[in-house]
Amino acid sequence: MTKPVITATTLVTEDGVPIDAVHLPGPKDLAIIIAHGFTLSWQRPRVWRIANRFNLAAGVIAFDFRGHGRSGGLSTLGDLEIMDLDVAVAYARALGYQRIAAVGFSMGSSVVVRHAGLIGGVDAVVSISGPGRWYYRGTERMRRVHYAVEHRLGRFVTRHYLKTRISPEGWQLVPVPPAEAAAKIAPVPLLIVHGDQDPYFPPEHARQLYLAAREPKELWLIPGMGHAEVACGNDLVDRITHWLDQAIRDPAPDAAAPDAASASERVPT
């Protein structure tokens, strides 16, 4: 059997930013769009491994956010990046995919949640190691991230050593936070995956997203898991793929807000 051809392409966002992307054709009508974490790229080994694993069961589109890798523009840390994801969703539709899922890691998690809540157009959302709110400085790792973003020296180091170009202007208006956007995702199914050993965002962020969201939703708090792509092993990728196949195939329940007391956490073992 001839192996499908991997296609690299450049997409252009609504505000004119060129986005470097790649398409891995899959065996089904399901496309999984990967939204990477801050300072990463679809070409980084940890992201490429996940893309290839998802590709065993679905088509995959991976791309570099603005200010990252070969994409143009400057990073706005999850604000304007929803337009980057939106052009990737449009690309998947143009390729003929009938079911589209957005899977985001860390910063990419905030993007997939905000995109689904504010713009829409996807059939399922997976948030992995994402924040529930902005400006969190409760861990040493996040204090370092804020220094890199807010100071000239930090942005210089990030540009030259991590190949990530950050907008020096900051946010003129504070974007809708992830938890607020999560409340608007239903009836699209939402899966929230978070490790109890995440050194950036503790599990409270996942619970904040979960409690804000309406059904259908699911929360996996995973013992021993760290943060984002590096902590997402092949077994977890496979379980997410299975969840996506079931969640998009099954009809969505009534989107009425559930009683918070009846909300359940599913903790994979």
Identify the role of each PLM range.
Residues 118-171, 188:
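Hydrolase active-site cap/lid region
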Residues 225-235:
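Catalytic histidine-centered segment of alpha/beta-hydrolase-like enzymes
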Residues 38-51:
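The serine-hydrolase catalytic nucleophile loop
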Residues 1-26:
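N-terminal cap/lid segment of alpha/beta-hydrolase-fold proteins
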Residues 51-72:
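Conserved alpha/beta-hydrolase
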Residues 185-186, 192-194, 198:
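Short beta-strand/loop motif that positions the catalytic acidic residue
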Residues 76-95:
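Alpha/beta-hydrolase active-site loop
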